[in-house]
């Protein structure tokens, strides 16, 4: 187990990736108050992924809504425990007609439900009058009693009250799993949108520099055409390339603005008012070669085991099994007959109290009591047996769902881990492609300056280079998203 903890810890450190990296100067702080970074930013200020996830976890409406689930479950437990609240009742019925007192019945009782199924009772009865029911008649001083009502078959081991409490307690685990599941999905999507925003920013920077190079080349070619060093068609070639790059840059600028707006959907203040990400805010850099680390040995198996224990979907299924298990015990108990015994110890006059203790000897107990026994039992039990069978079917369905979900989650962890390793290899190869494209561009530039190349070839080399760099940025963003996805697949992003 200790070795498993070490493996999981190492895996989570590797999964932290760029999220846990040290922030550069000017980074928006994650500490509260959170709205400060969004109130005013200066050029180049970084809004990091940690800042975004902090905003989302604390203030996003979905996160706040998910935070209400445990409180609802707590109130369900309180409601169920209310079934064991003591209850005081008092009833009085009297009749006087024609100046004659027919009867006066007064019944007051305190009933305290006990956890093991019995009810503790204490009360005072007084029934007097000319026509009072003999069953209710007492001496003028009244009759006090203490007693116990105990089920001896159905309701002895479990009853509706205890089942309601147990199911409400299981609901707490279900609510916590639902809260974590909803928050994890929200944080995962926020992380993916953040890296899309970072990718669009990186693409915009690359295309802006590429357009600047095309503009510089166009001006230089135009001057050389004026001086007669190049043919006029070369200036047309340079201008066409510049216009193409300007169109591509405009599209990239729109994509960046749209991704900025999309990211703003996650930003809310303490008053539940939406916030806008300032135009000057910039994302943290995409993960570089230093972050392209392999997963620690045995980490995939450790993460799969971790997911099996803490994944919200599996915890929800286990909580449902607990609830169904409590229901099965209750329904099985319903097959027993209803047999209960009521015993009340009686005393004339005021209720039992330490100031006037009764002499509870054997003779008193034998001559001052009220005893009742009740019995009921359905002959066919069709309803009870059908409900129990339905419960068993639900249990089996939930167990099968748990098995399937466990298999899918473990497969999901391994699938994302495979994508992680594949992306590492793709990143390494793409970095080499960028380096080779840079060498080709530099070589073509030298050939052009020596009069051995053309504007068309220079533009072609630059287009190949910028395409390679954009693809590298896309792989970097996908790598960062895969890190977040692996954390989610293992059971949590928060």
Predicted regions and their residues:
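Bacterial N-terminal signal peptides that target proteins for export
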Residues: 1-8
């Amino acid at each position: 187990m200790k070795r498993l903890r070490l493996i999981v810890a190492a895996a989570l450190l590797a999964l932290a990736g760029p999220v846990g990296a040290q922030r550069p100067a000017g980074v928006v702080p994650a500490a509260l108050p959170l709205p400060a970074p969004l109130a005013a930013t200066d050029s180049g200020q970084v809004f990091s992924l940690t800042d975004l996830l902090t905003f989302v976890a604390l203030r996003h409406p979905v996160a706040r809504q998910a935070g209400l689930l445990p409180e609802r479950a707590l109130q369900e437990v309180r409601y169920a425990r209310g079934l064991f609240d003591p209850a005081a009742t008092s009833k009085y019925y009297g009749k006087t007609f024609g100046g004659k007192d027919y009867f006066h019945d007064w019944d007051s009782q305190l009933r305290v439900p006990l956890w093991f199924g019995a009810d503790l009772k204490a009360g005072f009865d007084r029934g007097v009058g000319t026509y009072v029911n003999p069953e209710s008649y007492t001496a003028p001083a009244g009759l006090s009693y203490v007693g116990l009502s105990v089920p001896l078959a159905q309701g002895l081991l479990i009853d509706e009250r205890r089942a309601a409490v147990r199911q409400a307690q299981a609901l707490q685990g279900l609510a916590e799993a639902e809260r974590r599941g909803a928050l994890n999905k929200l944080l995962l999507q926020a992380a993916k949108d953040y890296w899309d925003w970072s990718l669009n920013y990186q693409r915009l920077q690359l295309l802006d520099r590429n357009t600047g190079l095309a503009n510089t080349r166009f001006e230089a070619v135009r001057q050389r055409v004026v001086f007669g060093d190049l043919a006029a068609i070369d200036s047309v070639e340079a201008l066409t390339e510049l216009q193409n790059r300007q169109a591509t840059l405009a599209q990239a600028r729109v994509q960046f603005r749209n991704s900025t707006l999309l990211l703003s959907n996650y930003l809310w203040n303490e008053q539940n008012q939406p916030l806008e990400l300032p135009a000057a805010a910039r994302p943290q850099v995409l993960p570089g070669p230093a972050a392209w680390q392999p997963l620690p040995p045995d980490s995939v198996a450790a993460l799969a085991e971790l997911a099996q224990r803490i994944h919200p979907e599996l915890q929800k299924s286990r909580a449902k099994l607990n609830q169904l298990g409590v229901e099965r015990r209750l329904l099985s108990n319903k097959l027993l007959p209803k047999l209960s015994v009521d015993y009340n110890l009686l005393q004339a006059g005021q209720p039992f109290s330490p100031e006037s203790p009764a002499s509870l000897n054997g003779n008193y107990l034998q001559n001052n009591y009220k005893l009742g026994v009740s019995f009921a039992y359905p002959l066919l039990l069709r309803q009870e047996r059908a409900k129990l069978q339905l419960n068993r079917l639900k249990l089996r369905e939930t167990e099968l769902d748990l098995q399937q979900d466990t298999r899918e989650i473990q497969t999901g962890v391994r699938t994302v881990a495979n994508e992680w390793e594949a992306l590492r290899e793709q990143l390494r190869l793409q970095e080499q492609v960028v380096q080779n494209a840079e060498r080709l561009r530099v070589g073509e530039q030298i050939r052009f300056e020596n009069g051995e190349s053309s504007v068309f070839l220079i533009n072609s080399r630059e287009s190949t280079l910028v395409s390679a760099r954009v693809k590298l940025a896309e792989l970097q963003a996908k790598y960062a998203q895969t890190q977040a996805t692996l954390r989610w697949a293992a059971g949590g992003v928060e």
